[in-house]
Amino acid sequence: MALQAASLVSSAFSVRKDGKLNASASSSFKESSLFGVSLSEQSKADFVSSSLRCKREQSLRNNKAIIRAQAIATSTPSVTKSSLDRKKTLRKGNVVVTGASSGLGLATAKALAETGKWHVIMACRDFLKAERAAQSAGMPKDSYTVMHLDLASLDSVRQFVDNFRRAEMPLDVLVCNAAVYQPTANQPTFTAEGFELSVGINHLGHFLLSRLLIDDLKNSDYPSKRLIIVGSITGNTNTLAGNVPPKANLGDLRGLAGGLNGLNSSAMIDGGDFVGAKAYKDSKVCNMLTMQEFHRRFHEDTGITFASLYPGCIATTGLFREHIPLFRTLFPPFQKYITKGYVSESEAGKRLAQVVADPSLTKSGVYWSWNKTSASFENQLSQEASDVEKARRVWEVSEKLVGLA
């Protein structure tokens, strides 16, 4: 009976999706009865209730759709901005590292390549040596490009910049790392333009390179653009190592202003007699002064981070290859066990890579160092290495020497 009743009722009427009765169902419904009881009035009430319930449910569905649409419309700008920001960081960063065929430069290139987030342009004097070094270090082939750069020739610096631009790669970070150190030299040697070699390579070559590439850094869309110049504790006379004779001293820059050619001027920045170890230390003071002057002239308008660093004493580096054999033998254990300042090339490379890429090291105008637990900190520079007026004068004289003024 229950099934029969249900069949009679379902055949008697049907309801459209919008909650209204079909016409045929309505007329049939008026004349129907079940078990002698009229269904007309009761069914009318039931269908009115059903119709209202359907309308309420439809209204709720419509309201939810409107709310979802409003939420999407409201969040669209931020989603779009976020996606654009992500697109900026999806590509690998491009970093130029000078002197990347050995020592600190190679260790840095390797550390950056291993992250998978950087493409390293190895700017080196010896192309084949750099290629072999990258392969020996296990750097993936697509993680680096070797390009020729001889910092002892300003023409080579200009040619490197031209070749780099022809490659149509953006420049996101420039690392000025290459250096020459002649601690036992009694007579100066000179660059192609006639500058004393240590200052010519370590300072003037990098100065021209940085000045020419500053526009490329400005044009980068990378989130954190940086220019890093490697300094040295030996040029910082407020440290124990910086007070080991001969100490760095730029004097009144008379030798630099005279061209450092050893002919009509001294080959030393301060105008004194040539001392190979001092020439290196003086060049490092110039590096640190130049970094600070870049910061003052460009950081506020460009957002580029300018920094210098001393990654620790890499006592086994090839930088000391021209020292006497006894020094090369005793210096590493002395640094490792007495001063505790020794770091391996690998560790130093990781520290420099940290200054290249670490989001926590974006402060500009800073000279970074590391403590014995390998934690980075802002170190203080000596009075001369932080002299604002001297930095300005070094900048202006250097511009003239490299042909920019």
UniProtKB/Swiss-Prot annotation:
Tissue: Expressed in young seedlings. Not detected in leaves.
InterPro entries: NAD(P)-bd_dom_sf (IPR036291), Prochl_reduct (IPR005979), SDR_fam (IPR002347)
Record has Plastid as a keyword: yes
Nucleotidyltransferase is among the record's keywords: no
E.C. numbers: 1.3.1.33
Coiled coil: none
Reaction(s) this enzyme catalyzes, per UniProt: chlorophyllide a + NADP(+) = protochlorophyllide a + NADPH + H(+)
UniProt record, GO biological process: chlorophyll biosynthetic process; photomorphogenesis; photosynthesis; response to ethylene; skotomorphogenesis
Gene3D superfamilies documented for this protein: NAD(P)-binding Rossmann-like Domain
Domain of life: Eukaryota
Pathway(s) it belongs to: Porphyrin-containing compound metabolism; chlorophyll biosynthesis
Transit peptide: 1-69
Disruption phenotype: Lethal under normal growth conditions and light-green stunted plants when grown in presence of sucrose.
Localization per Swiss-Prot or TrEMBL: Plastid, Chloroplast
Main localization of the protein described in the UniProt heading: plastid
NCBIfam families hit by this protein: LPOR
Subunit composition and interactions: Forms large complexes including TOC33, pPORA and OEP161 during pPORA import into plastids at the plastid envelope membrane. Interacts with CPP1 during plastid import.
Family statement drawn from the similarity comment of this UniProt entry: Belongs to the short-chain dehydrogenases/reductases (SDR) family. POR subfamily.
Function: Phototransformation of protochlorophyllide (Pchlide) to chlorophyllide (Chlide). PORA may also function as a photoprotectant during the transitory stage from dark to light. Functions in skotomorphogenesis, photomorphogenesis and throughout the plant life under specific light conditions.
Protein name, UniProt field: Protochlorophyllide reductase A, chloroplastic
Biological source species: Arabidopsis thaliana
Gene that this sequence comes from: PORA
